[in-house]
Design a protein with these regions (language model features):
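Structural preference for beta-strand elements that scaffold enzyme active sites
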Residues: 17-21, 49-50, 87-93, 119-123, ...
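Beta/alpha (TIM)-barrel catalytic core signal, keyed to glycine-rich beta->alpha loops juxtaposed to Asp/Glu
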Residues: 128-317
């Protein structure tokens, strides 16, 4: 039986999600199939029921199709581990890449076909192309919701202004406003989420926050101080990464004092935002799943003093 993880509601929707969401990105394509199956099965066993997938172009050079194999593989893995989609919140994204040649319903149906699913629990809208105004995008999403193949909708990396405009337009066309916004949020980057304009926009929509990039690409794990490999191994000398990498090393001291790891502590910070419903993570090992889940209980016992120390280390005021 899956371990119990706390759940939060996404905004004003009826959707309840585990406090940790597992993203797939292109991760599974880079792993041996057996390892990917074990990882997904372990995440489900630990109680993660919020799974994020999307259509990505192939970067391996070996996928049988140039784009969307990430979705094909995700669906195959779900079936291989015996997952019941109806018991999960599975999310995907509208990229609007082929707009207006492909509308929102067309993009959704293509993704569902590749995953071999009938329905999504959550559909995100990525940032809009210049030729797609917010009112038209919301009308497109209204048409998607009318199909019954999506439970709720949300946005990814939208500006506060566009989110506010979408909320107003949703009221005009009589659909629910976005229930969540997936935005970069970490000890290394708080500006987007903590901008007062974004807080106002989230409040107006009644939307939850889903932090992404919680470890700043792995920099906040502290592992690179020991020469570990990872996504940033080719960027360790990039000055744009230096602050996050230094912060990852600095987190070792407070993490040790709390009996945890820098990665778990960094994820816990994102869970403390009052609007956070779930923090989105990436993982390639069961240990990384455990570290993220440990952050849920850690967030519940961090004191105001602990948080003040973290913000001081990150030079956040």
């Amino acid at each position: 039986m899956a371990a119990a993880l706390p759940h939060h509601r996404l905004g004003g929707s009826e959707t309840q999600v585990s406090r940790i969401a597992l993203g797939s990105w292109r991760t599974f394509e880079r792993m041996p199939r057996a390892d990917a199956e074990r990882l997904l099965a372990y995440a489900l066993e630990r109680g993660i029921d919020f799974l994020d997938d999307a259509r990505y172009d192939d970067e391996t050079g070996s996928a049988p199709i140039p784009t969307g194999y990430s979705e094909v593989l995700f669906g195959e893995l779900l079936r291989a581990v015996g997952a019941e989609p109806a018991a999960l919140t599975i999310s995907n994204k509208l990229w609007w890449e082929f707009w207006p040649g492909q509308d929102a319903i067309g993009e959704l149906e293509a993704s569902l076909e590749r995953m071999e699913l009938d329905r999504l629990g959550l559909l995100y809208s990525s940032t809009l192309p210049a030729e797609l105004p917010v009112p038209v995008a919301v009308e497109q999403i209204a048409a998607v919701l009318a199909t019954g193949r999506v439970g709720a909708w949300a946005v990814v990396n939208w500006s506060a202004g566009d989110l506010a405009a979408a909320t107003a337009e949703a009221e005009r066309v009589a659909i629910p406003p976005p229930c969540a916004a997936q935005l970069p949020y970490s000890l290394a980057r708080t500006d987007w989420v903590e901008d007062p304009a974004m807080d106002d926009a989230l409040a107006a929509a009644g939307a939850s926050l889903i932090p992404s990039a919680a470890l700043a690409g792995g920099a906040l794990s502290g592992k690179y101080a020991d020469g570990a490999s990872g996504r940033l191994r080719d960027e360790l000398r990039d000055p744009r990464r230096s602050a996050a990498l230094q912060l990852g090393s600095a987190l070792r001291r407070p993490a040790a004092a709390l009996g945890t790891t820098p990665a778990t502590l960094a994820i816990a910070f994102t869970l403390l935002h009052p609007r956070t419903a779930a923090t989105l993570i990436g993982a390639t090992t069961p240990a990384q799943i455990d570290a993220a889940i440990d952050a849920v209980s850690l967030a519940q016992r961090l004191t105001a003093g602990d948080v003040a120390e973290l913000r001081s280390l990150a030079d956040l005021r």
